[in-house]
């Protein structure tokens, strides 16, 4: 049994770490092959494809010219804007954080309104999250949270609305209660058993959202973050229905394609019917196998990470390290940092080149499907944190070149990395953020 990234991030590693001993091998290029470094989490598939030489790339119409804003500079805030709003937290002062966001050139924040927990009809309901016991968790909660989370969200959105340059996307991470022994989370309003039920839960929240705030500043709604990994029990249901796991094949089977399209498109259809004024999507990894799935999305949010390239994971030992008490220990930080620096020095141009090919393929797919392309978290390692043992230089270099790549492939939305939150040291360098954001906004 492999432990999914959704499980680890949603409710932590407590109670789940025993499964790491039998991780799933990373899927490499071409036919399935063994790896000396088993991955305890789903990794992006690194398989190659025959390039799509469709005429769509020659289209003179640029969808972004008819969208508002014309470019999105995106900051991924997940649940941290609520979970770190406690006294002493990095989001304690919403006015200060929002002003700093504008100062750094961001115009779109990506937030999880937690529809499984939050009832905006009863916003003063006290919600309690136990201490996650994860001292090396970069996002979300880093200590116990107690308070009227619904009121905090209302306060946050009302203050965001006072800043005319700011927009937001809503994104569902669908954190759930963990196995026995996991830190306690609030009582669920409802647990979805399929994507359609997830859409119904979203519809309840969005109805209340419209009454309180309207929809003017919502860019789009990401119904489920990084399908299929974060939506409750989806991976297990897909395997049961199709006889094969999502990460088991280098190309999706016909049964898998049918299952994914049916689940996702029906949920999107329900929400489009009830809220025709909103855009809906589900975010995905930069996994080229998605190009075979006929999804009907209004926007396409793709997350491109280095673990899609075995040349990076083999050199850095990333898949091994994240299987060693992720969020709970720093004992492998120094080696991971040193390996990452050496890898960047040796093959950064090669890694960038392959990542650009993936961007080109998704850009073409987005054009053919009629969807603007964004990335709200991406590029190098999806796990890093401020620590004396971890050097950020190589990661920030990757972020710098990513803006030119996003411009080349006509991305609507871009982010430099998935650490654009006020608790990170990089946040204090306002000029660094502003320079990159201005470059993208003026492209």
What does each of the following model-derived ranges do?
Residues 98-104, 145-169, 184-223:
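An active-site-proximal structural segment forming one wall of the substrate-binding cleft
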Residues 170-179, 203-254:
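Active-site groove signature of glycoside hydrolases
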Residues 41-108:
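N-terminal carbohydrate-binding accessory modules
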Residues 386-443:
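Aromatic-rich peripheral "rim/lid" segments of glycoside hydrolase catalytic domains that contact
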